[in-house]
Curated annotation (Swiss-Prot):
Residues 20-32 have a biased composition (Basic and acidic residues). It comes from Rattus norvegicus. SNAREs, soluble N-ethylmaleimide-sensitive factor-attachment protein receptors, are essential proteins for fusion of cellular membranes. SNAREs localized on opposing membranes assemble to form a trans-SNARE complex, an extended, parallel four alpha-helical bundle that drives membrane fusion. SNAP29 is a SNARE involved in autophagy through the direct control of autophagosome membrane fusion with the lysososome membrane. Also plays a role in ciliogenesis by regulating membrane fusions. The gene is Snap29. Forms a SNARE complex, composed of VAMP8, SNAP29 and STX17, involved in fusion of autophagosome with lysosome. Interacts with multiple syntaxins including STX6. Interacts with EIPR1. Interacts with STX17; this interaction is increased in the absence of TMEM39A. Widely expressed. The keyword Cytoplasm applies. Residues 195-257 form the t-SNARE coiled-coil homology domain. This is Synaptosomal-associated protein 29. Keywords: Autophagy, Cell membrane, Cell projection, Cilium, Cilium biogenesis/degradation, Coiled coil, Cytoplasm, Cytoplasmic vesicle, Golgi apparatus, Membrane, Phosphoprotein, Protein transport, Transport. InterPro entries: T_SNARE_dom. PANTHER family: SYNAPTOSOMAL ASSOCIATED PROTEIN, SYNAPTOSOMAL-ASSOCIATED PROTEIN 29. It is a peripheral membrane protein. Its main location: cytoplasm.
Amino acid sequence: MSGYPKSYNPFDDDVEDEDTRPAPWKDARDLPDGPDPPIDRQQYLRQEVLRGPSATAASTSRSLFLMYESEKIGVASSEELVRQRGVLEHTEKMVDKMDQDLKMSQKHINSIKSVFGGFINYFKSKPVEPPPEQNGSIVPQPSSRLKEAINTSKDQESKYQASHPNLRRLHDAELDSVPASTVNTEVYPKNSSLRAYHQKIDSNLDELSVGLGRLKDIALGMQTEIEEQDDILDRLTTKVDKLDVNIKSTEKKVRQL
């Protein structure tokens, strides 16, 4: 026999009292309800409106910083390419000098090969040797396209450092640096903070567009410079091969004396 009375409902134990039910979960961002919105609600709405433009302005500022960093790397790489051109031109000049000296040695060897008239002819008609060249430093001249791109980027870098002295802390404080005269305020919101964000975003995007154009000029200038240096390498390879053949020929003639 069951110990419960006949009128007892065992499922009544599963029914929770309404007063003991947990309160529904609420997001911290949920706005309070009520006929009169408090000041916190207005502040929250204002922050929500500015959240998107603020993040976009910060993102474009970071992109602008990265663009200038890339441009600095491009300029440094271009200058290294110019230095490499100087090395190649100096090497080519030295190979040309070696070729001239070798030709002069071959003339001397040919003049002393004759047993009877060699020495007489050597002293009578000694060829005039060209004066030794001064081994001064060679100033490399890069392609005009690369030179112009380097100068333009360096000039812009000085302007950028003047307007953004703290390059690694581009943040919303730069909003105050946007000149009002450079933009048409009629196309922006009336709210001053929101308008400042929109102006900063447009300013960053314009600067990014111009900067990417300079990066493209650097890339094209480097391409032209590399093509010209490839021509120097081809000439240098041909001259070195020819010099190697002449050295072996001269060495053979000396052994036959």
